[in-house]
Amino acid sequence: MRMSVLGRRTVFLLASVGLISCGATPADPYVEPIDPVEHCGGTCWPGETWEELEAAALGWSTDALDRVREQYAHMASNALLVVDRGVLVVRWGQTNRNHIVQSVRKSFVSGLYGIYEGEGAIDISLDMAALGIDDSVPPSLTDLEKQATLQQLLQARSGVYHEAAAESQGMKDARPERWSHAPGTFYYYNNWDFNVIGVVFIQLTGEDLFQALYDRFAVPLQMQDFAPSNGFYQYETLSEHPAYPFAMSAQDMARYGLLFARQGQWRDEQIVPEDWVEESTTAYSDTGGDFNYGYMWWVGKPDRFHGHRMFAALGGAGHAIFVFPDIDLVVVHRVDAPTYRYGWNEVMELLDRVIRARQ
């Protein structure tokens, strides 16, 4: 049987550092694991491209990974990418294809807020009245609704239940009655909140949202596929405030996940303030499922994810960046929305299988 290029490269690498003899074959039942810290001469970071190693060389169970692949094939997902301690161990599917990220966009903008708040350009304690925010589509905001702060919008706790651009039918069906909850008293996953977060960012910084994503994340993280032209502003007659969809590849999303897995640091630069990473991935609301909610990040409930701390950027039927900071692990899952036929139960089963293979 012919060995893959990656397999030959890994065997050569192991032999070159003295971990296996030159006569060993991929069929050997045991391979001495590589320590990524020693292998990289310190912490592993991607450069212009990702470094890839066989998962078995990093101590993963090949049998358990076979079960991951079975689930992945069953789901017909578009891509799965797994980063273990800064090194790619799984790259399946179209990991360089730019898909619309759906609601994963919100966690990226949360990161931008952290940067600009740290620089003093944004104050999340400001309310809608102070910012001059209303909605020109009737009925406009009441004085009570205008007391909602940016922090409450980040938490999806504004109490403003105005119709919004890019709402799914499920969001529309779940929207509370207008004026039924005061700001800060109730969680509802609210596109009006998230869209206004984007509008206020532009207002306070004077910068285009997609250019800021490029300058603040794509450039320093050396993203391979993202450009400002990947995004657009989606206006609808329901509200004056647009949504801000953008497309990104799995391999670029993984860089953002790794940034947050490492407390906002990239190599020797603190991109996102460490205290913002902690604050934005803290749970403020119980969503009723496997997750709580932070500042436009989903926060895994204790003991649900094999005892690990986990937070995630989730979007659509299955777009996800799962971040496990305690074990320096990032998992990115992508779907081709028009053809994908499964949902979050299958995605979570896939993630469970990944964690079992890692352990």
For each feature predicted by the language model, list its residue ranges.
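Active-site-proximal alpha-helical segments within enzyme catalytic domains
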Residues: 196-200, 244-265, 319-335
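Active-site helix/loop module of the DD-peptidase/beta-lactamase fold
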Residues: 118-156, 205-243
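Active-site SXXK
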Residues: 86, 100-125, 153, 197-201, ...
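Active-site Gly/Thr loop motif
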Residues: 225, 230, 281-330
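C-terminal motif of bacterial Sec signal peptides marking the signal peptidase cleavage site
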Residues: 20-21
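A short, well-structured edge-of-sheet supersecondary motif
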Residues: 64-95, 322, 328-332
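A small/polar active-site loop signature that marks catalytic segments
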Residues: 155-234
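Short active-site loop at a secondary-structure junction
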Residues: 74-79, 91-134, 145, 182-189, ...
